[in-house]
Amino acid sequence: MVREKKHMEEYRRWLENSQDNDNLKAHLEKMTSEDVIREAFHKDLEFGTSGLRGVMGVGTNRMNEVVISRVTRGVVDYLYERENIIETGKRLKVLISYDGRLYSREFAQKTAEVFAQYGIIPLIFDECTAVSVLSYGIRQLDADLGIMITASHNNKKYNGYKVYDNRGCQILEEAAQAILEKIDKIAYFEYEFRDVRSEGDNITENPVEIQWLDGTIEKRYVNDVIRYFQNMNIVDGKLNLAVVYTPLNGTGKRPVISALEKIGLEKLISVDEQMIIDGKFSTCPNPNPELDQVYELGRNKLKENQCDIVVATDPDCDRAGVFTRNRRLSGNEIGILIFHFLCEMRKRQKDVLGKRRRLYKSIVSTKIVDEIAKANDIEIEKTLIGFKFMGNAMDKSPKKFLFAFEEGNGYLTNNLIRDKDGISAAVLICIVTSWWKKRGKTLEEALKEIYDEYGYFKEENAGYDLEGIKGKKIIENSMSELRENISVYAETLELDMAYDYLTKRAYGSSDNERAAMEKFRGLPESNILEFESCEGVSVIIRPSGTEPKLKIYFSARGAGLNIADAKIEKIKAKTLDVIKGLIHKA
């Protein structure tokens, strides 16, 4: 729930508390427009299962050191209560990582300083590091918690603060709510010991020092990834493949290059301009592997060097994308190729892979993998959108784990960690591409072969960027209007059934209760609406959890790809007309 604040009152309080901080004071004094002050101070930056994410700047609704200090103090209080530190005297460890964004290192160091002040040992990487290395490191170092300073693939204005539990999983709602309750009790600029300190307590009386970590954990993870694939018998010497790699000015440079070198590529070319850590993302303003434009420099290298594919990872290296000689593959298409390959390997190596029989996928990911799974005796566990759900789900049965993915270019290809990973995904993408190349096929031809065998499915996405106070209200009002008139909109879209993941109700079925039970089994409540037809057409609408955006997902099945395409175009046109009307109305 968003708690509105009296923005001018809060602004003046920050001014009063900035007298000893010339930099903060100068930024506050530059805020002469009340609209600017309102946007920055009308509420607290929301903390949830994805932690914090927002535009960097001064204010309670912005990413800055004041906000981070307060939130970290809330995490401290949460840990003190969870671990009963005052009575047990237990000394906790927190692992902290950060990407190469502007101020990420400073935010990470501030986070470490707060933990150290309260007697919690902060272990912090001395260089920006990938998300997967954090998840792996938490498990290897027996850390009690992890913090990742990142805004993933958002543009340069953004930064974020993600919280991981002691299994290397992103926290879920219960933990997020418990932390938020602690944060809410803390006033800005007031981080004294208050309710955690007791007289004579040797934990808070003796602050600890920050411990800086070198690249050992990263190297160990890369080696373990390669060993994991070797144990699966899917890495067998030199790969007849020429690859261009780009980290999009992010953290992937060291680990991905190292991993790709270890699998023996025939040729590995890097995009020099994008190998440099650059928080301004000068070469790709929106560093998202889902966008064609981020591959422009890589495609030039591909043509110059007659390579097979371009592989890209995003700034915190938790997503991976592919551009072939012809086009960018969608996140779903990459997921299809990897999953199909793993199923083929499983057929050939029952003794090694026989027990690995579970696929994890989000509800917006392609449905063709359901057909592939059925044909290959693979269990499917569907989750809500976000690897926080998949990581927590697979942690319950890691030995059964085969693969996890979501349509937004997020893949988990090993059970060493509990979050999506661009490092191991980049490796497996190259292995899969080489496997098909040995059979005389490109990735596009491979996809056609898979569609011919399992059915013709098509997916597309759309989204509306709606920033600021006004944008947030538009998103809220649009979702409310759709929810309150869900059956009417199902009829407008000419779709038979509708599902509300927040109320867990189904509409339009001959047995709504049974339909709801099947659709929502094992899923928590979420602000998602789905519309579906009996002919295999589906529309899912939701607010993004990480961006000021309304997201729409389309999927269709047809007797051929052209028919599936036609169905997508038809439902997309109808849906976008509805959404545009709602936005205009709001």
Report residues per predicted region.
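Gly/Ser/Thr-enriched, mixed-charge loops and adjacent short helices
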Residues: V36-F41, L45, N159-E296, K301-L302
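Conserved phosphate/anionic-ligand binding catalytic regions in large, soluble enzymes, centered on
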Residues: F41-N61, A151-S152, V243, P247-A259, ...
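Glycine-rich phosphate-binding loop plus the immediately following alpha-helix
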Residues: Y164-V196, G335-I336, H340-R356, K361-I372
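N-terminal small/polar loop signature for handling phosphorylated ligands or for N-terminal nucleophile
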Residues: L95-Y158, E261-V322
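Phosphate-binding and adjacent anionic-ligand microenvironments
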Residues: C307-I309, V322-R325, M345, Q349-R542, ...
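Short Gly/Thr/Asp-enriched flexible loops that form oxyanion-binding sites at enzyme active sites
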Residues: F107-F115, Y158-D165, V256, D318-I338, ...
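An N-terminal, well-structured beta->alpha segment
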Residues: V2-T111, I203, P207-N240, T251, ...
